[in-house]
């Protein structure tokens, strides 16, 4: 990244995260995306006419109609001149949009960009693969779009991603007790953050139309339902004697997040006040089955590009697709627990897969501001053996 004229974050916004068939069940992914985009633009002080491009992550687009990112832009009230691209990099989609936007800005291709992600896992449809040519006789199979394209390995058929996480947890000799304790602490942090109002500067409320009138959703749904005392009693999720449970896995969720990006020189020229600069970003790829440890490689590469060490970073966000993902990063990189996911992670808050990359950047920036810190680094594991990471610094 050019430090002479760095890419900067002008604003951020995210919706609350709803549970599976929960508070946001009646809201399409594109409407969630539009809500986050509209709020991010309003908070940035940028005239919508200045926005040239929008990138939005969306992993489960079946049934949404053409060009989900374009729909989100138009529904948000952006000019029809805004170019839109929908990005699918599985769980890394929302972060990849920020990386792509940053690269476009650094290259001088555009001046103002929106980057984000959106997902309604609740509304992912079931698919009938044979009906194009006709099922003819007998029974057919309905494929769950959410599971097939979001939660199932593409290289070993019918294997849930959690089975690979369990294998790696076994290799690390992570105990059930350690993972339960991590999930309980993540839930405690999320519940405390909600009680203390820590998420208020991130969240834009979603209006849900119901038969009884509009309902305003302004709080993450799932932490309020969490019961720490129940976590140690849950059955293993992916192996008979396994150590990973539903509580130490991220929950199926709905939500969206968006950020407005530009270059420092443009912000200065137009009287806009940036919040943070993007210092570096990186990606890493390895064996698909080892996706849960891929953030270690991405974080190391990102630190090298930034010229930082682990000790230079004030706060980390490592997406808790499973609790063990953050625990692997803590183990391999020496990240202190009190520096990682300080307001709770996806095991407590939820993981709307196309949105989470943008969501954790949003939460990281807000946490740095709230706690008076300066440098942050966010990373996610990605199905297929990949990971991305991004380093930011408050201005």
What are the language-model segments listed below?
Residues 112-168:
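Flexible glycine-/small-residue-enriched beta->alpha junction loops
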Residues 14-15, 25-34, 43, 178-269, ...:
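N-terminal extracellular/periplasmic Venus flytrap/periplasmic-binding protein-like
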Residues 163-166, 202-204, 279-348:
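Active-site pocket-lining segment
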Residues 87-119, 169-198, 258-265, 330, ...:
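Active-site-proximal alpha-helical scaffold in enzymes
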Residues 2-64, 68-72, 76, 80-83, ...:
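Conserved active-site "lid/cap" helical segment
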Residues 58-112, 155-161, 225-251, 332-359, ...:
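Conserved catalytic cysteine-centered active-site region
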Residues 1-30, 39, 228-293, 297, ...:
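Condensing-enzyme catalytic core mediating Claisen C-C bond formation in acyl metabolism
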């Amino acid at each position: 990244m050019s430090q002479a004229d760095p890419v900067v974050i002008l604003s951020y916004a995210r919706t609350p995260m709803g549970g599976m068939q929960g508070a946001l069940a009646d809201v399409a992914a594109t409407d969630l995306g539009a809500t986050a985009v509209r709020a991010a633009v309003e908070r940035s002080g940028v005239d919508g006419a200045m926005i040239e491009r929008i990138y939005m992550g969306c992993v489960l687009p079946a049934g949404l109609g053409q060009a989900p990112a374009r729909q989100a832009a138009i529904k948000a009230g952006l000019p029809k001149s805004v170019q839109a691209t929908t990005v699918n990099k599985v769980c890394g989609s929302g972060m990849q949009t920020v990386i792509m936007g940053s690269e476009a800005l650094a290259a001088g291709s555009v001046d103002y960009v929106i980057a984000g992600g959106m997902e309604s896992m609740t509304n992912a449809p079931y698919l009938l693969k044979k009906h194009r040519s006709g099922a003819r006789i007998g029974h057919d199979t309905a494929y769950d779009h959410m599971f097939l394209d979001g939660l199932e390995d593409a290289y070993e058929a019918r294997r849930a991603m959690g089975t690979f996480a369990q294998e790696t947890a076994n290799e690390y000799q992570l105990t059930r007790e350690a993972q339960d304790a991590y999930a309980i602490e993540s839930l405690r942090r999320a519940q405390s953050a909600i009680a203390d109002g820590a998420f208020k500067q991130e969240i834009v409320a979603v209006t849900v139309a119901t038969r009884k009138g509009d309902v305003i959703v302004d709080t993450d749904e799932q932490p309020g339902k969490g019961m720490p005392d129940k976590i140690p009693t849950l059955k293993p999720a992916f192996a008979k004697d396994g150590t990973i449970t539903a509580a130490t896995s991220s929950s199926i969720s709905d939500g969206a997040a968006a950020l407005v990006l530009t270059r420092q020189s443009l912000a200065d020229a137009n009287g806009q006040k940036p919040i943070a600069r993007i210092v570096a970003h990186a990606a890493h790829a390895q064996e698909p089955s080892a996706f849960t440890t891929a953030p270690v490689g991405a974080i190391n590469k990102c630190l090298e590009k930034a010229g930082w060490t682990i000790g230079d970073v004030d706060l980390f966000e490592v997406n808790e697709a499973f609790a063990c993902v953050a625990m692997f990063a803590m183990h391999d990189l020496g990240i202190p627990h009190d520096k990682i996911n300080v307001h709770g992670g996806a095991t407590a808050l939820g993981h709307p897969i196309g949105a989470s990359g943008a969501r954790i950047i949003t939460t990281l920036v807000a946490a740095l501001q709230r706690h008076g810190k300066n440098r942050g680094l966010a990373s996610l594991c990605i199905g297929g053996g990949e990971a991305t990471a991004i380093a930011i610094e408050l201005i």
